Every structure is written in structure tokens, then in C-alpha cells.
Amino acid sequence: MSVPWARVRAMRLLHTSDWHLGRSLHRADLRAAQSAFLDHLVDVARAEKVDAVLVAGDVYDRAVPPVDAVELCEDALLRLHDTGARIVLISGNHDSARRLGFGSGLLEKAGVHLRTRPAALARPVVLEDAHGPLAVYGVPYLEPDAVRGELPPGQDEIPRGHTGVLGHAAGCIRADAEARGIRRRVVMAHGWVSGGAASESERDISVGGVGQVPAELFAGFGYVALGHLHGQQTIAPQMRYSGSPLPYSFSEASHRKGSWLVDLDGEGTARIEQVPAPVYRRLSVLRGRLADLLGSAAYGQYEDDFVSVTLTDPSRPEGAMDALRARFPHVLVLAFEPEGVLPDQRGYRARTAGRDDLSIAAEFVRHVSNATPTAAEKQLLASAFAAVRTEEAAG
């Protein structure tokens, strides 16, 4: 006998990503802030009776994380497991897939599912409720040149680039779900989907100058839980980035951080609610003359914030950082741009903001040789960056 929808609880998922455990903000220690977020995440999972927590990559900030970051992750996974939720976690471009995936077979038996190997991306975590099965597929970050030989086989040759490998992955997932007869399907992936807005804190993943993939690759899934971009955002109603739980650059000062609470009914249709993350310490970007910043009551509201300051005095004031720190104890960045400065006189950080590695390297070649790099030189630079990414992906 069928159960009326009104009486049947939906499958509830909690989508988070980009914890970047072990990361600092301009050398400011963020361990307490990251710990506070994980406490919040556990509280949400318990209070909302979450069935599964989806962690869409970049658990750690680097391939070999510090010991305290590993301990923080272990504690968080243990406490999330104690809420009764299953956990599905994929590796991101900052993670070492092999290290993060250690012990995955044992952890699977405890309900913690690590999807870090490309070969396993079409092997779902199957959740059951009164509506029947729901398949969660975890696609780890796929570095195109490094994983082509590790992907599940398909009928066609895999094109080069991110679109090629992710398109192949999506095709393998659809084929597996059809073979299993499972209609409700959720996909987790780590990458840059077209329409998503980047910040200054994501690592460039472009290959041959192309880092984005079309959203159409993931058409037809009940929900797509994305990681990589640090701003919480919606690509399509059923396709979202949770974003990082903390701001990891001052370009994120205006971001509202959080997670997504996702309910899936019997048809796989998502009902989605934003869950705001706690604000450990605000980020503020200030600009003005030193005397105004130190003396004006208008700046009093920023005294407990992490602060980035750009001074516009006609000449560089002496002892500016010490003076600023007396009023703003958590000032982290000090830049100097006198009023009327020409664009090419900006600092290095301002000139490179939002640019990919290849264009920055090409500008360096122009600077030292006084000539635009040739096509062969650009190809050499692109190959060098690809080799580094492949080495990082191998762990």
C-alpha cells in the first residue's frame, strides 16, 4: 500500500564543502573558527535529523595537512556519524586523493563513504527511505591529464580537458543508475561550473586556459552538490555550491557563508533551505588616509574585525602598521595606493587578482624579455603548469 506524501518524511541531506582545514588567513590562525563551524555543522545534522552529510571536496587546504587539521577532521566525522547520519565525502583539488582515501573500505562499513578514486565514481552510496532507494554518486576532483587512465570505461574516447572527463563521468553515472533502476539520483562534484562566480581564494584549475565546464553536463539529476567555488551560490535550482564555511580572502568579505539543507521527495524533487554559518570574526576592507582611519568614530565598528587597509595618503606614512594595529588589533593587510595613482602603478596583488596562472606567467615573460611570449613558449608554460597539477593530484 502506498504511503501518502504528507505522512512520509523526505530524505534530508546537508551539503557542505571547502572546509580547507589547516588554512590560515594572511597568517592568522583559523583553527578556532574552523572548529566552531564544525560544532555548528554537527548541531545542524542532529537538530534537523539529517540522513546524509555531503562534503563536496577540499576537506584540507593542502595535500599533506598539519596534524591538528587531521585531528579536527577525525573528530568532526566521528561526531557527525554519532548523529546517525551517513557521510559521503569526495576529494577536491587541494586534497591528496590517496591520503584522504586511506582506510576507505573500513570506514565504509561504519557509514562514512570516501569517494577519492576516479574508478569508483559510478559506484553510488544507496540510501533508503519510505520512497525507495536514492543513489548518491561522488565524483572526486578530476585532474584531466592525470585521471584519464583511471576513469571507468565508456563507449567513446574521452575528450581532453575538464569538460571531457566530467562529461564522461556523468555518462557513466547515468548508465549505472539506469542499470540499477534508481530514479532518485544525487551527484557530488568538485570543479568550476559555468555561471559560478569565483573569489581570490580558489586555486586555478584551468587546463589550456579553460577551467569551466557547462552546467548541462549535470542535467537531469535530482540534486548536484558542488564544491570548489568559495561563494555560496545557485547555478540552477537543483545545482548549487555550498561555498566555504569561512571567508579565506578579503574578496569574500561580503559573502554570506553557510550550507544547504536539501529534502528529496519520492520524485527526487529538491526542497532547499540555506543554513547560515556562524560568523567567527567579520572581514572588513577599509580605505582612506591614516589619520581618518585612526581618529574617526565611524571606523569604531571594525575594531574587532579582520581588517585589510589601503592607505591613500599622498606619501607613505611611517609606522603605519603599528599605528593601525593599536586601533585594529586584527589588521592583516596593509596596501598603499595614493590618490590619483595610475592603474599600472598598483601593487602586485591588485594587478593579478582574478587572473589565471598562465596569464600571470606570460606577463612575467613580457616583463623580463620585453617581448610577448611566442605560441611555443605559451605551450611550454601550459605544459609546466599541467605537470605540476598532475604531480599534486598524484599526491
Regions found by a protein language model. Name each.
Residues 2-78, 82, 383, 387:
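N-terminal active-site segment of His-dependent metallophosphoesterases
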Residues 5, 9, 47, 52, ...:
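Accessory, non-catalytic peripheral segments of nucleic-acid enzymes
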Residues 16-17, 53-58, 86-93, 113-118, ...:
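Active-site neighborhood of phospho(di)ester-bond hydrolases with catalytic His/Asp-centered motifs
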Residues 18, 38, 58, 73, ...:
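Divalent metal-coordination and catalytic microenvironments
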Residues 24-26, 59-76, 91-111, 116, ...:
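Metal-dependent catalytic neighborhoods of phosphoester/phosphodiester hydrolases
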Residues 50-68, 85-98, 191-209:
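Active-site neighborhood of divalent metal-dependent phosphoester/pyrophosphate hydrolases
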Residues 102-208, 276:
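Conserved catalytic scaffold of divalent metal-dependent phosphoesterases
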Residues 194-195, 199-268:
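Conserved beta-sheet core of the metallophosphoesterase superfamily
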